[in-house]
């Protein structure tokens, strides 16, 4: 059979495996890639290729992740798997591999374990929108009632963290049996059922270009006779000449009109997501705009000073702090293109945060920044990164 050629026209969805150590995340990843390649075309990867995860840098933090790709009948999936628990924490907080949905792997022999719970909490905090469950190692449990019990526990745990536990697809199977080509109920058919659950339960993500216009401002220029130009990379949506935009963050929100868009010194009618462009603003003075603000479609994003966040604190080995920090610590928070000083408040009962920890905290900034839940930031001290975080909830 000739190799199926890679189709770019299928919708692209990002997923990943989460769950407790040794519950079978990497084996399942290999099984999905292998069985999809066999059934729907594409290239298979074996367990050893996935397990030897290469190091990546995201915001100066070293993370080990493996990426595999596979096709279902209707989609192309990019799947991320991490070898160690710390890699998951870093990956999810930095957004190095954004997930449109996660596959929670839970061994039926163990039931939910500490990292099962922690990964569900992290998914909630960093805004992973959907979770599908694969109950693994079901071939090793001969009591149907025990399987029912474990499934119920997992569903309750999901509900605890505001995921719809009762409606979440739970697939029973054995990643190892599937990988070995087993034709029984827990073999290949369980993995195909999982892929079908991904296809139906995780909605197609909205593309950046279809979202509301947003462009972080990197630079501001004054062009004599033309006015003020702000430059940056369009993060989402499209901006057209003649449209109204808001300048949000740091100062009071201003509304202005786009009188020109240029890219590489050429005039355009519009700037689109992913493009670096200059936007000419009508009647805006050079001193009214600064780096760190954003241009946005009116009414779509608001400036805030207070938020709750999930933060990973770099270890000493990663170039982070050598000592813990306490309540009231005031570092710089780097959002998009600029640093803003903020004070942190730790949760009750937490005295200090050690390098290498991940922690929930509340932050109050000295200037407002345009933000929504899911926005990533770095924590810096004297120009070096000491942490990475994500906005879990805006509070003021």
Curated annotation (Swiss-Prot):
GO terms for molecular function: GTP binding; GTPase activity; guanosine tetraphosphate binding; translation elongation factor activity. Residues 19-26 are annotated as: G1. Residues 81-84 are annotated as: G3. It comes from the Bacteria. It catalyses: GTP + H2O = GDP + phosphate + H(+). Keywords: Cytoplasm, Elongation factor, GTP-binding, Hydrolase, Magnesium, Metal-binding, Nucleotide-binding, Protein biosynthesis. It is found in: Cytoplasm. This is Elongation factor Tu. The lineage of its organism: Bacteria, Pseudomonadati, Pseudomonadota, Gammaproteobacteria, Moraxellales.
């Amino acid at each position: 059979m000739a190799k199926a050629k890679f189709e770019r026209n299928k919708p692209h969805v990002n997923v990943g495996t989460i769950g407790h150590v040794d519950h079978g995340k990497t084996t399942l990843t290999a099984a999905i890639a292998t069985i999809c390649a066999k059934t729907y075309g594409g290239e298979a990867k074996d367990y050893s290729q996935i397990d030897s995860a290469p190091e990546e840098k995201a915001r100066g933090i070293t993370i080990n992740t493996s990426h595999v790709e596979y096709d279902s009948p209707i989609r192309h999936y990019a799947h991320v798997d991490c070898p160690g628990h710390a890699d998951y924490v870093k990956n999810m907080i930095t957004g190095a591999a954004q997930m449109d949905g996660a596959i929670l792997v839970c061994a039926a022999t163990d039931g939910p374990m500490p990292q099962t719970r922690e990964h569900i909490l992290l998914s909630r905090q960093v805004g992973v929108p959907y979770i599908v469950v694969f109950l693994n190692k079901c071939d090793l449990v001969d009591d149907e009632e025990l399987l029912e019990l474990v499934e119920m526990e997992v569903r309750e745990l999901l509900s605890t963290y505001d995921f719809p536990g009762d409606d979440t697809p739970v697939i029973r199977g054995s990643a190892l049996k599937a990988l070995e080509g087993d034709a029984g109920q827990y073999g290949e058919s369980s993995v195909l059922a999982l892929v079908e659950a991904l296809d139906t339960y995780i909605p197609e993500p909205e593309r950046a270009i279809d979202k509301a216009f947003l462009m972080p401002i990197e630079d501001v220029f004054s062009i004599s006779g033309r006015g003020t130009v702000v430059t940056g990379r369009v993060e989402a949506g499209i901006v057209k000449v003649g449209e109204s935009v808001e300048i949000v963050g740091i100062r009071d929100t201003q509304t202005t009109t786009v009188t020109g868009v240029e890219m590489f010194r050429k005039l355009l009618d519009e700037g689109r997501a992913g493009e670096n462009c200059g936007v000419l603003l009508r009647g805006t003075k050079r001193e009214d705009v600064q780096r760190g603000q954003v241009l946005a479609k009116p009414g779509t994003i608001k400036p805030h000073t207070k938020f709750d966040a999930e933060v990973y604190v770099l270890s000493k080995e990663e170039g982070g702090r050598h000592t813990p920090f306490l309540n009231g610590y005031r570092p710089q928070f780097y959002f998009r293109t600029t640093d803003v000083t903020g004070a942190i408040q730790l949760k009750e009962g937490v005295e200090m945060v050690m390098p290498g920890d991940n922690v929930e905290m509340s932050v109050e900034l000295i200037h407002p920044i345009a933000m929504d839940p899911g926005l990533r930031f770095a924590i810096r001290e004297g120009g070096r990164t000491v942490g990475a975080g994500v906005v879990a909830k805006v509070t003021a």
